[in-house]
């Protein structure tokens, strides 16, 4: 009772904070819009329509600002991840439907949540816009000022009200330290951008060259495809074989890194909130136990209900202990899923680059283009929601399994009924072993007596040809009635395994938990497939390299035309035939990849059989 009253006194403690992040979020829209207008004014419009009188004064200013290229951005990945992480607290408020700027009827809650999401996105838009802007000097100053403002507001909120109602001391710090860390990282990033852009603006350093559309890892991937496969040097370690192997020819886009970091922070906040709810429920249960004891003390003088009281108290105690213990395995399961999703993303992308779609269900081989474009916007948010809901469901299932384990194994030993428990456990294991043994025996009898012998000594199994047909028909007849009973258990085991796998893999958006033929009902898996195809079509290294060659060659030709007396300059050096150079490159490619000769079209009158045979012979050597 004393502990309960102490906790009650701690819950009743209130704090008047003059700085509220929720209220500041509304006022932050004003500087956010100002920063957006400044960056939009600096952004030039590349394609302008014919100007009229109303837009004459604007010129080619006020271009569209891109906060983040969700498809092809591979630089500043951790900076974008920190910007996503700074929004974690607001994302959790949106997830719990606790952030509603307006009070409307129940049927209009969806519109209110949409407006709230737009307000949160607009408030944090300057972080992303300043990171992606080409005008680094101005954007670094604006981004640093805006990040510093949010940093100061967060520090003031933590310092004014550090303690809370549920966790007690430093509760506010427990909730807001991830956002504070991300804001500090952004401050350092914007300061670094300012120190790099200032010498360029003052003319002390040359201006950086225009960024190429071909990333370094994409060029390495194409070079690896065009080169001969090298023999593997040494054996792979256990970590490389079982966990992860780093690939220098592959990089995760900024969207995936930001989603991963935001999912980690949201999962942490979700666990903290869940623990706060658990503390509140535990206090209520303690008060319920005290009231139950006092009530039964006055009403139950004979003591007939005492065993029921003890069982209820034992159930409450076991449930509370199991719930706390299973927090760690449930959290580790979801953390493992996050890393595994990255590994699956790389594996699936490489298969799509190689033209392999066999790992996808048949109906997802050609997804809708519109649905794929929407999927690239849905994926990040859905991935976080799947992880949070998956953690809660996994935690509940693990808690139920823990309670069953306690009542099945631990509590009988505590109550000195271990021998009875072992007897029941032994009978259950024996029954299950007999059933499984009969199933295996049926397979052995069928393979030994009812199949014809192997056709060759190298065959792995007997052919599917019946032998001893009369005995086989009697075998089927007498086992028919037993298999009816066996099918009941098989049906229940199918249901149990499906439930366990479904709940265990609910957070895995990279694979469907639906049956074959019903994968289209899994919207999360559809978003994953659509996102993969968008990335495949827009970041394929071979396609990007081809476009890069076209763009650079086009620029070179335009530059050659602008140079005066370019004919004289070109005649000064040796002249090469473009056709001969192309044939030389073709020969080099065929020598490195002799199997490609079989895929070439043969022209009439040009027999290349000897050359093909030579290349194929070289490939076999």
From Swiss-Prot:
The modification Phosphothreonine is found at residue 612. Pfam families: RBP_receptor. GO terms for cellular component: plasma membrane. InterPro entries: STRA6-like. Glycans are attached at residue 12. Residues 1-21, 75-110, 159-173, 280-321, 405-424, 498-621 are extracellular. It is found in: Cell membrane. GO terms for molecular function: retinol transmembrane transporter activity; signaling receptor activity. Residues 43-53, 132-137, 195-258, 343-383, 446-476 are cytoplasmic. It comes from the Eukaryota. Highly expressed in liver and small intestine. Also expressed in spleen, kidney, colon, stomach, placenta, adipose tissue and isolated adipocytes. The chain crosses the membrane at residues 22-42, 54-74, 111-131, 138-158, 174-194, 259-279, 322-342, 384-404, 425-445, 477-497. Induction: Induced in adipose tissue after high fat diet. Down-regulated by holo-RBP4, retinol and retinoic acid. It is a multi-pass membrane protein. Acts as a high-affinity cell-surface receptor for retinol-binding protein RBP4 and mediates RBP4-dependent retinol uptake in the liver. This is Stimulated by retinoic acid gene 6 protein-like. It comes from Mus musculus (Mouse).
